[in-house]
UniProtKB/Swiss-Prot annotation:
Protein name: Cytochrome P450 306a1
PANTHER family in the cross-refs: CYTOCHROME P450 306A1, CYTOCHROME P450 508A4-RELATED
Class of enzymatic activity (EC top level): oxidoreductase
Entry similarity comment: Belongs to the cytochrome P450 family.
Principal place of residence: endoplasmic reticulum
One Pfam family cited in the UniProt record for this chain: p450
Residues annotated for heme binding in this entry: 505
Amino acid sequence: MSADIVDIGHTGWMPSVQSLSILLVPGALVLVILYLCERQCNDLMGAPPPGPWGLPFLGYLPFLDARAPHKSLQKLAKRYGGIFELKMGRVPTVVLSDAALVRDFFRRDVMTGRAPLYLTHGIMGGFGIICAQEDIWRHARRETIDWLKALGMTRRPGELRARLERRIARGVDECVRLFDTEAKKSCASEVNPLPALHHSLGNIINDLVFGITYKRDDPDWLYLQRLQEEGVKLIGVSGVVNFLPWLRHLPANVRNIRFLLEGKAKTHAIYDRIVEACGQRLKEKQKVFKELQEQKRLQRQLEKEQLRQSKEADPSQEQSEADEDDEESDEEDTYEPECILEHFLAVRDTDSQLYCDDQLRHLLADLFGAGVDTSLATLRWFLLYLAREQRCQRRLHELLLPLGPSPTLEELEPLAYLRACISETMRIRSVVPLGIPHGCKENFVVGDYFIKGGSMIVCSEWAIHMDPVAFPEPEEFRPERFLTADGAYQAPPQFIPFSSGYRMCPGEEMARMILTLFTGRILRRFHLELPSGTEVDMAGESGITLTPTPHMLRFTKLPAVEMRHAPDGAVVQD
């Protein structure tokens, strides 16, 4: 037997106390040195935010609920406060669960980077708007906002906004008709609201982004809807690959990633056909527009010549104001594109990466997905909660029944209670519960904390909106949280459904218009109920968005004529 090794038969060996000392002392010295270096760094630059320990290489990932990661982070927020840090794999992640901190962080340019996510950014390649950064992101965001405003996304009343409202209303009215048709087919008037909502809302976004709409049975449209529904779930299921890329080799993840990549390729092929057709339409429209402008120019020249000849024949004629404005009237208007794709093609510089084919394809996908995913999930939650909360629905009917069967934004927007119901839906079920992750572009000190460059910054909207201090009994659906004592709408400062800062949703106002028209017109035409004996799991399904589990609703049609309420509360037909 050696002095250093204890022989335990043929089963192995154990180091002696002396050997362990030789190994442990240098290791302890290394740990002490690392600790002192960290303390020195913290003294100079600030300490990192507090947070839980994780496992080597895995970080805190094993302790997150894969089905509801937003709830796991909510529990940590209760322990550590409005800001804490953990490791997602090897990615340092700062989680914000206080609205004031979110606004403070996201107003800074250093926080406008993209999060270091392997899967989503690998698929997107740094193009589009959601996963882009620096020049590509800035240009895409600026142009997108300008184009949306040109389509009518403004709070200012006028023809431009009215034109956008009419385009949205066509899709809303189609949805109402589909609900009516499906309810008549069912003996109990029970309808799955998802297909009608997805088709009609999707076609609104198709019209605004691509300048086209689809029939319900169009093969391309059916495929795009299926891809969107499955893709939103799969990216959530495979999300751990973002932090542990080697997991992409597991069979389940191989299948998921293959589905996403094949879906991307097929989607881009469909988009290429749409772009080509739109380009041809744009050329034809511009040609017709130029011909009309030329006719107007020739007509003005003819009128000028006739006026000149008339003056020569009668010099005593006085010069009119129209004569003075002749030069101004000769200025030709330019053709105004009718969708985002037309705007892109009209200003495209084919030599710039900002307008390359990859950027166009990914931008179109981002705008379509962002336009549909969040609004669709919000509408589904809204209808489900109103079917559960009959008190709230009755109050809405009292406000909506005196209006015509298709109320306008001008009629709906003053209804503070309707807006409060929409806001309460977005609070109680944040459809993007962890927001869109940001990336910290460089080392950054805020307050007493040091944020390492390359960190992922997460806005925990779920924790913010479910904070019992800001929203007592947060699981209770109470639209009154958004009303003042005199009934006016007022959003609490902790309410941030569209995030904040430079990367906040660029289509916020358009989303409000869409949600207001859908909710107002659907509730004006139908009474909603859950089928008898039905229980719906209100926890929802987590992916990129938080969506309701599949469910049916009972749609009972309300009178199309305007109704008023008698003093005793009875409904009276006008």
